From Swiss-Prot:
PROSITE patterns: MFS (PS50850). GO terms for cellular component: plasma membrane. GO terms for molecular function: transmembrane transporter activity. It is found in: Cell inner membrane. It comes from Serratia proteamaculans (strain 568). The keyword Transport applies. This is Putative multidrug resistance protein MdtD.
Amino acid sequence: MLIKHTASVQWQLWIVAFGFFMQTLDTTIVNTALPSMAVSLGENPLRMQSVIVSYVLTVAVMLPASGWLADRVGVQRVFFSAIVLFTLGSILCARSETLNELIASRVVQGIGGAMMVPVGRLTVMKIVPREQYMAAMTFVTLPGQIGPLMGPALGGFLVQYASWHWIFLINIPVGIAGAIATLLLMPNYRMQTRRFDISGFILLAVGMATLTLALDGHKGMGLSATAIAGLVVAGVAALAGYWWHAHGNSRALFSLRLFKTRTYKVGLTASLLGRIGSGMLPFMTPLFMQVGMGFSPFHAGLMMIPMIIGSMGMKRIVVRVVNRFGYRNVLVAATLMLALISLSFPLVAMLGWIWLLPVVLFFQGMVNSLRFSAMNTLTLKDLPDRLASSGNSLLSMVMQLSMSLGVSIAGILIGSFAHHQVVTDSPAIHSAFIYSYCCMALIIALPALAFARVPADTTTNRTLTKEPGTGSTRLQQ
């Protein structure tokens, strides 16, 4: 139990918990503020997806290096640096006067965010006994669950009653306190490390960044066709280069032996495709409510809370659902249900049934959470122990990458159908959102074809179980 920890360990757990809170709060607080940011910066609200993409893509790129840095340099130094970078990025975001300045500032913020959560997990592993690890992780991740719940409403409140700058300024006092506490209270644990695959890291980083920028380049950044073609060629070449680099390389960042496990290969591919569609939802929903329906920022933020409550509630029963119906049936059904629910949301809103919107969003959150949890455990469940850590790291990176791709595609869709002409709550913008949601529903539904290839479940020797005191799952043999 946590009450058995010494005072110094308790303080260290609180430091990690606040790091989790800062990082997860920032993933949702910005979405509600995008239309107001656009007005302040003189930009089109339908071109603001780069503010989210820059942060999420940076997190995806930097994740593989964070654990190695913590082991090599020490968790205290890396965690302190993460908080400082995140806080500095927040200050730069608040001072931004152009969209390009804001995007660059979000990159700085993303570097800090990428190091905060994985290094926090390593810290907990080192400061508590193994038998108390799950209880400690439950304690430090609870603020991380509260962050997404507070984010949309808090962001809407600050935008409506202060200004969008305050969604970043509120990070400053928390960041300063966290940085000081880290220096004073957190030991600088280090572990012996193997040589970091810098070549593989650079190749993967270049591949992910260039392909995502190419996708967002024309609508979001105004790049020419020649520049976009160059980015695509560079991205494909970098990823092909990594495949050649990793072939037969025992020190590769991610071993190609991972893909010899069928469920991992199918699960990772389906997770990438599935999360592209799901990644559109947190961006599209508040944008539609404000630009499409004329909701105030605070009202739009409050409307997002049922979706997050539904997501958190489903985590309590997901184990029983998967064990009862099996991975393939659950994933195919949840994918198709999510597509239908997502498509129904704008239709219900335009029919004037505002009272029904929280119900739709609640079920959307439940189904999305069910699919996420099942995708994660399916992907990792058959990996041998020696590949489990590497497989989990690659899955985490793919999750972040697919979210950035989803936001980019959502921005392309709504920008194309609206022709970048924004008249709030007008028939033209309604049509643009309907067309965008139809395309989004199709993108969400397509991974059902991949999930249909998941092998039939054999639950005689494998049972999905829930870890005590957490929302996470594991497999019993």
